[in-house]
Curated annotation (Swiss-Prot):
Homodimer. Substrate binds at N13, Q46, N66, G76, N77, N166, N199, E217, R218, G227, T228. Belongs to the diaminopimelate epimerase family. The record marks H168, E217 as: Could be important to modulate the pK values of the two catalytic cysteine residues. It is found in: Cytoplasm. One of its GO terms (molecular function) is diaminopimelate epimerase activity. The active site is at C75, C226. Pathway: Amino-acid biosynthesis; L-lysine biosynthesis via DAP pathway; DL-2,6-diaminopimelate from LL-2,6-diaminopimelate: step 1/1. This is Diaminopimelate epimerase.
């Protein structure tokens, strides 16, 4: 079976985007992995699927598969590429669309300058809903934030659990470029306190409106940018009293602008969405 695809990226976080409305998509976990392979497939951090909605109050359904073949709840950078894709393909003439994801609905708006703003909804901070199981962990309060101590590589990592529709553990560090992200990231991702694994974010505060961020993504490893990770990091930074909205987040792949007014207000993310190329791939050519 041959599939039409579009290769896109949002601040360097790269995706294979597939139209699941006009072509049948029934891939195995192994096929998703092969499609994401940078040696044997197209290569991507995640695969994004456009589907018909399952409810009447939204325009599309948005599904995400990680490079390891697992389906996940959300991807913020992918959401920006999603609305660019459906607009460029003539699947909608709206500048703003409502999209269902695994755990809710998000609103995506294409701006006149080509940037995309995503209404990510309110952050979820209740540990059980992240989900996070902190029983027995040391606790430290800073501002409105409650951080929990994980023993990682012989050090205590003080993490703030935040869900942006997917789970994040945010750690504030002094020098993110020289921090051992590749060593600590997998240990946090697979820590027993996160039953569904977790995206590990490493946040450096530059000033009250500027931050640097690296994210070790669940099922993908470190990526050049992570939209939900940037949102979670800003939420944690604001709650700790270290940041004020709006915040420009510098990632290795580019800048994301994050705004949050606190409490139950939605987090708003603005950033780029770029089409790289289009193509056709024969699933029979992928390794089994």
């Amino acid at each position: 079976m041959k599939l039409q695809f579009t290769k896109m990226h949002g601040a360097g976080n790269d995706f294979v985007v597939l139209d699941g409305i006009h072509q049948k998509l029934d891939l195995t976990t192994e096929q998703w992995r092969a499609l994401a392979s940078r040696h044997f497939g197209v290569g991507a951090d995640q695969m994004l699927i456009v589907e018909k909605p399952t409810r009447e109050d939204v325009d599309f359904r948005y599904r995400i598969f990680n490079a390891d073949g697992s389906e996940v709840e959300h991807c913020g950078n992918g959401a920006r590429c999603f609305v660019r894709f459906v607009t460029d393909k003539g699947m909608t003439d709206k500048r703003s669309v409502r999209v269902e994801v695994m755990n809710g609905v998000i609103t995506l708006t294409l701006q006149d300058d080509g940037q995309v703003t995503v209404d990510m909804g309110a952050p979820e901070l209740e540990p059980a809903r992240v989900p996070f199981r902190p029983d027995g962990l040391p606790v430290r309060t800073q501002g409105e934030d409650i951080a929990y101590g994980l023993e990682i590589n012989g050090r205590t990592a003080w993490i703030s659990p935040v869900s942006m529709g997917n789970p994040h553990a945010v750690q504030v560090v002094d020098d993110v470029e020289n921090f051992p992200v590749l060593q600590d990231g997998p240990l946090i991702e697979h820590h027993a306190t996160f039953p569904n694994r977790v995206n590990a974010g490493f946040l450096q505060v530059v000033d009250r409106h500027t931050a640097r961020l690296r994210v070790f993504e669940r099922g993908a490893g470190e990526t050049l940018a992570c939209g939900t990770g940037a949102c979670a990091a800003v939420v944690a930074g604001i709650r700790r009293g270290l940041l004020d909205s709006p915040v420009k987040v510098h990632t290795h792949g580019g800048d994301l602008n994050i705004a949050w007014d606190g409490g139950a207000e939605p987090v708003r993310m603005t950033g780029p969405a770029t089409t790289v190329f289009e193509g056709t791939i024969d699933l029979a050519a992928l390794p089994a």
